Amino acid sequence: MAYSYTEKKRIRKDFSKLPHVMDVPYLLAIQLDSYREFLQAGATKDQFRDIGLHAAFKSVFPIISYSGNAALEYVGYRLGEPAFDVKECVLRGVTFAVPLRVKVRLIIFDKESSNKAIKDIKEQEVYMGEIPLMTENGTFIINGTERVIVSQLHRSPGVFFDHDRGKTHSSGKLLYSARIIPYRGSWLDFEFDPKDAVFVRIDRRRKLPASVLLRALNYSTEEILDAFYDTNVFHVKGETLALELVPQRLRGEIATFDIKDDSGKVIVEQGRRITARHINQLDKSGIKELEMPMDYVLGRTVAKAIVHPATGEIIAECNTELTVDVMAKIVKAQVVRFETLYTNDIDCGPFISDTLKIDSTTNQLEALVEIYRMMRPGEPPTKDAAETLFNNLFFAAERYDLSAVGRMKFNRRIGRTEIEGSGVLSREDIVAVLKTLVDIRNGKGIVDDIDHLGNRRVRCVGEMAENQFRVGLVRVERAVKERLSMAESEGLMPQDLINAKPVAAAVKEFFGSSQLSQFMDQNNPLSEITHKRRVSALGPGGLTRERAGFEVRDVHPTHYGRVCPIETPEGPNIGLINSLAAYARTNQYGFLESPYRVVKDGEVTDEIVFLSAIEEADHVIAQASAKLDGRKLVDELVAVRHLNEFTVKAPEDVTLMDVSPKQVVSVAASLIPFLEHDDANRALMGSNMQRQAVPTLRSDKPLVGTGMERNVARDSGVCVVARRGGVIDSVDASRIVVRVRDDEVETGEAGVDIYNLTKYTRSNQNTCINQRPLVRKGDVVARGDIMADGPSTDMGELALGQNMRVAFMPWNGYNFEDSILLSERVVQEDRFTTIHIQELTCVSRDTKLGPEEITADIPNVGEAALNKLDEAGIVYVGAEVGPGDILVGKVTPKGETQLTPEEKLLRAIFGEKASDVKDTSLRVPTGTKGTVIDVQVFIRDGVERDSRALAIEKMQLDEIRKDLNEEFRIVEGATFERLRSALVGATAEGGAGLKKGVVITDEILDGLEHGQWFKLRMAEDALNEQLEKAQAYLSDRRQLLDDKFEDKKRKLQQGDDLAPGVLKIVKVYLAIKRRIQPGDKMAGRHGNKGVVSVIMPVEDMPHDANGTPVDIVLNPLGVPSRMNVGQILETHLGLAAKGLGEKINLMLEEQRKVAELRKFLHEIYNEIGGRQENLDDLSDQEVLDLANNLRKGVPMATPVFDGAKEREIKAMLKLADLPESGQMQLFDGRTGNAFERTTTVGYMYMLKLNHLVDDKMHARSTGSYSLVTQQPLGGKAQFGGQRFGEMEVWALEAYGAAYTLQEMLTVKSDDVNGRTKMYKNIVDGDHRMEAGMPESFNVLIKEIRSLGIDIDLETE
């Protein structure tokens, strides 16, 4: 395989055995594809597909006025250009969005003409607000913050059949129900009650008999019975009856008389139960009719009304029971035949017939009125109102929509073949659902599993945005309808009709404050990717935490390859928030699909298909690890999944095979090496804690990884990836300039790519985003190569933590209960030092008393406090500041107070103005120490710009100019290179001071200035033309870049759009360096977390026989009970990786030959299991580069479920000349004595989590108090106190510490007078206290009084 630029510099030894079938797809595709479909940005009018914005417009337009004389039609839309790019939006705190312009057509019809002749047509583009754009990394910038819209897993529209699991009725009887869920509109439920009648509910209101709905659909009683039942036909023959025989229907009944064939032979004796054998005999005997006594039909139900043949009088109504009287009438009236319903107790219950009997309505109108009364109780029903209401419920496209998904699911469930159809319900649909429900009650068919992923679908960003947009449009529609009637009379234009505010508001609300629009978790690249791939069952139209039961949260067999069974939060959201599996994607209906290889006759093919949970059920699917010989499945029985069960089958039966063992898990879980050896609960913690790792100062790749690290780093967007191949022209810390290869440059494009690197920027979680170049000048890069590392990446691989030398042993109780003992060397080498960036904001407002002013002239502040401020009152970049230091000086006007005569005199003499203003400067918060790394000033239009703002603006303009000049320099250089190759050797006609007939040489060209080249006149016309073209191209380019510069300059110089009343905003960015210290939380990747308890001097740490001390000591007791043995295997393999690195280091120091290096590398990569690496393709220099990068250890990849085996780990340890047990004798650093047994020592990848003691430590002496109770507030953010709670009070009571308790409950808490007195006393040096009445006691008394109880405290 060909290695990319970074891969060949550091090849990972890969232990995977299974063939590589398919690359992991682009990890952010779910977000980007969905939003791209929503916007359809590049599409022309004819290319628009019926999805996204286009579909939303088409569903609401055309809008027709109430009179029908005017209509507003939708023609198309276009998106403008964003005003600012992403970085500017973040800086200015605005939304990254584009204006949406919709072309609409207003048509006015002629009132007079009968056939609607068109009187007037006006077409116009209307502005419909701003639509947020997605950045290329799948996020949105809303008001300057990066947000992610999480996909939602909700119940798919369609029809679902279920039962109550016997919980409703005390008898435990199963009550079946059916529910039709539309995409939007009213829900329709059918349900059985304990007496087996069928009821209907609309939108969960009170229930009505189901027959009411059928009558409202204009079915008569006979039609209803006809639809649901077969009939038995009886012929009346004097005193007996003859039944038209259908033998199957007799099965299971008890014969009440002898059943004989035509010859008189008895087939079934009286009193015997009729069995399948009897039915066969009846079939053979060919009996068509069966004679029976009259009383056989008593109690049966009439299927069609029985009518007197002579008079036409109705003898028995349809759906009534036959009694002795009725039979007598039938005989008397000489009725020849009648029909009864065929029902029995086994598989054909009389449910619908019984329901009709309790139904009080008799015709359509009564049924409609009944439904109207249920939906609108208290309103008087009229025929029209009832009809309109019923029609609008399920049969009007604007109120009800099943959607394409819903229709497909509906038709599949009720057994139709076609998957397309109308979005509204029909009479037939409702009857079909009832039939299916009755069949299920009769024992035919099964209920649905609502947790099956075939019944839950994913709503992505695009779809949710479209829904919100439609909501906005519907609001607009109402307003437009009313204005349309005026449009004809007043000659209005479309612009005057449409008010875009509701649309803009709906979109803004969705992106800004929807439950699924979340502040992006930006701790590290993994947390970003995971957040974008998250699937939540919560949110609007989803579940709520409280109502979600155990079943919804549990892992379902259909999750396999679609949703990760491991990664989900702990706590109340467990199982409701999931993560997409590595290979999963959504199909056009929104169902999750997983890829499989097609297997035919036991042979695996190269064809890969994506299947949803519905399509997969009938397949027999082998695991990715099934043994293959070439392409044939070898084993006699293969472990497979079939019908959502795990079983074994013969190879011939297998139809599909997994593409990779890691398709089961999510990205985060697939980064845990030896995941297969960890308990699931700990793996869950491991995948969650990787997301909390803080990017360290120097990223360090994991020695033991899984091979997924490269994918995550590349797809997360934190690295700089080459857009086009080429040569590095120049590179420094802040940008990379690439001269693009000629064959990748489109005509008219610049042959240069400039990549500006992000330097020391704040992330959402206050961690530091910084990019470092990996390339050198002159390097050749291809498209897709990684050119610069971002936070937590090392040479294009994800690097969340550091490789630490660990020993598993107890050490003087310092690692009791998961504590961690660290070596001081870790601190000295800055292994876990992180940079955090805080943004502090100072806002200058216009107050009632006058504007606040940002200035260095602050009253009552000494010179020392101002020495870090410039003349504008803003701190210098680079200043080191500590708690309480002034960052931005600001004064606020103070209200005029009544002055005493003395003060007036003093002010008259000295002109003292200081008392007019108070100091409201921005100061560094307590407990924060750092360096100012950036200052931004935003000024409202019309306010004068101060010196600092002008300096910042000049600096930014210089940067932009430098970029554009660089771009022009390269374009110019490339153009002249092309000209040089064309001109050298050609003949000149003159110009530029040359004589006619001179042959151009390199020397001549070097002697001319570039501008002079264009003055050359050549003998060949083609060359002259080329010179002209080149000159025109360069002047165009220069013009283009100048325009670009002017545009940027204009943007910089225009005032900022600040909130009302705000004059100026100053943002100061502080970089805070945090070393690891006791109290910080650390973790491995296997859920093994702990808190640093102590940092020991290096000389006291345990060390091996060579004197190498360990970095970290972990407690071995943390492993067995937690069953995360993966960490031990990682430690062993890490030791081998490090040992091999040391051997390579030794070879390089001894300056061995390259051939020896090659041989050793070949042993490592190709002789101990796993994937073979093609080292022969590398040049000697590349082998040396590779070896240099392997000095600190050979990185290994052990993919999940396909990783290194025990024998391979041992072989690696042997190759590194280390003990195969992975254990060694350690010595106590303090005494030098050997420990009593050998210890497991190795290298583990440790993370520092974003739970730092600096953020949690907090102390208060005095501070703010709560308004009502007068007790101190709580929490660090409020600068609150520590709660002395109920149990703590008991403790002091138990000790009898009465005085301590008294001050806790009074002066230290809420005795207002007592605490002020106490403060005074302390100031005066008097340390006595008097306790008064706590304020909370007064609150209690007031509460009791509010209940109407008069309570008073009496003093004795």
Swiss-Prot record:
InterPro entries referenced in this protein's UniProt entry, alphabetically: DNA-dir_RNA_pol_bsu_ext_1_sf, DNA-dir_RNA_pol_bsu_external_1, DNA-dir_RNA_pol_su2, DNA-dir_RNAP_su2_dom, DNA-dir_RNAP_su2_hyb_sf, RNA_pol_bsu_bac, RNA_pol_bsu_CS, RNA_pol_bsu_protrusion
Reaction(s) the record says it catalyses: RNA(n) + a ribonucleoside 5'-triphosphate = RNA(n+1) + diphosphate
A Pfam family it matches: RNA_pol_Rpb2_45
Iron-sulfur in keyword set: no
EC assignment: 2.7.7.6
Gene Ontology cellular-component annotations: DNA-directed RNA polymerase complex
Keywords: DNA-directed RNA polymerase, Nucleotidyltransferase, Transcription, Transferase
GO molecular function, one term: ribonucleoside binding
GO biological process terms on file: DNA-templated transcription
Enzyme class per UniProt: transferase
PANTHER family, per database record: DNA-DIRECTED RNA POLYMERASE I SUBUNIT 2 (PTHR20856)
Functional description taken from the UniProt entry: DNA-dependent RNA polymerase catalyzes the transcription of DNA into RNA using the four ribonucleoside triphosphates as substrates.
Subunit organization: The RNAP catalytic core consists of 2 alpha, 1 beta, 1 beta' and 1 omega subunit. When a sigma factor is associated with the core the holoenzyme is formed, which can initiate transcription.
Family of the protein in this entry: Belongs to the RNA polymerase beta chain family.
Designated name of the protein: DNA-directed RNA polymerase subunit beta
Organism listed in the record: Stutzerimonas stutzeri (strain A1501)
